């Protein structure tokens, strides 16, 4: 705990993961907390040793994995209108908006978090910056463009949701979040994106990153529908001190790759 110089907080609808890093960017510890009710969140923040002992002295980034987000081209973005952009895709009552730049400042992702939830985090974590969780997926996938085919779907799995990106001729043409609970959900949403992009299902490539068990999807079922499918792990750029690397067993993007 004494070596902690930075915190990454991965905040899902029913899960909080705390990654503590030292001054060299090495992950020194990971705490994973499932929860059901929001009042449990405050108890988690109170008892976590990394947060309770170091959160007032180090930088912390809260990655919010929620349906409340939208992408805006930088040339059209006005920071004073962030809530307006977000309101096009979700209701913003009782929500605070935030934003961050992506793709060498060509894109801006606007996210939202409940005011009451943000107040809980702010109570226990100083120097808190906010980013939408999908920003990690987009940044990673844009870096993979040179390796992509002319028609490619990329899927990042995060708990009970997926981010699906569609690339045509190595350019991002589609990106959105979907809640997936079974094979039927996955096929429904992926087929919808394929149709929207006019992709040939028999020839386009689909790349999946993450743990299929988190969305209750079976590889053998998907291979009946996708002939060019690859399940992959990112090339590791996230480094660990001995003992902390077990986080990679989650197969999460954040366990392998650091932006």
PLM region spans:
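Hydrophobic/aromatic-enriched cytosolic interaction surfaces used to assemble or bind macromolecules
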Residues: 1-259
């Amino acid at each position: 705990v004494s070596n902690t110089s930075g915190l990454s907080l991965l905040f899902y609808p029913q899960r909080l993961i705390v990654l503590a890093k030292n001054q060299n960017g090495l992950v020194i510890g990971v705490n994973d907390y499932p929860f059901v009710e929001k009042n449990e969140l405050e108890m988690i923040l109170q008892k976590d040793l990394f947060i309770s002992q170091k959160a007032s002295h180090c930088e912390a980034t809260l990655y919010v994995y929620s349906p409340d987000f939208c992408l805006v081209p930088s040339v059209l973005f006005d920071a004073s209108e962030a809530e307006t952009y977000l309101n096009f895709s979700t209701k913003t009552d009782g929500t605070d908006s935030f934003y961050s730049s992506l793709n060498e400042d060509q894109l801006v992702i606007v996210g939202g978090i409940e005011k009451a939830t943000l107040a809980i985090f702010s109570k226990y974590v100083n120097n808190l910056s906010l980013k939408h969780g999908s920003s990690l997926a987009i940044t990673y996938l844009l870096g993979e463009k040179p390796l992509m085919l002319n028609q490619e779907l990329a899927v990042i799995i995060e708990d009970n949701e997926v981010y699906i990106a569609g690339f045509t001729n190595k350019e991002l043409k589609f990106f959105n979040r979907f809640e997936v609970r079974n094979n039927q959900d996955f096929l429904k949403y992926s087929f919808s994106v394929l149709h929207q992009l006019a992709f040939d299902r028999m020839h386009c490539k689909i790349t999946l990153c993450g743990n299929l068990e988190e969305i209750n999807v079976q590889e053998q079922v998907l291979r009946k529908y996708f002939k060019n499918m690859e399940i992959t792990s990112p090339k590791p750029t996230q480094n660990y001190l001995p003992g902390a690397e077990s986080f990679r067993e989650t197969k999460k993007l954040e366990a392998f790759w650091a932006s």
